[in-house]
Amino acid sequence: MLRRKPTRLELKLDDIEEFESIRKDLEARKKQKEDVEGVGTSDGEGAAGLSSDPKSREQMINDRIGYKPQLKSNNRTSQFGNFEF
């Protein structure tokens, strides 16, 4: 590894303003999400996320990542196709 002098980073006013605007935007989104979750808890939907049921937890994860599992049948046509001789 080569030794070199540390690179100097300068914090500019534009950078600070950009950081503040992004932080405010993220805080607004977080508040909005908390408000939506607050409404869901009164309906009982929010409690499902806290339950220890592995099926519901797995389903929540699959929904979050967009995974839709397909059930596989165990017959030969599904494994090898429909071959006719």
From Swiss-Prot:
Region: Disordered, residue numbers: 26-85
Compositional bias per record (Basic and acidic residues), positions renumbered to this chain: 26-36
Record GO cellular component, one term: anaphase-promoting complex
Keyword Cell cycle: yes
Listed name of the protein: Anaphase-promoting complex subunit CDC26
Keyword Manganese recorded: no
Gene encoding the protein: Cdc26
Polar residues bias: start-end ranges: 71-85
One GO BP: protein K48-linked ubiquitination
UniProt-listed InterPro entries: APC_suCDC26
UniProt feature coiled coil, ranges: 7-37
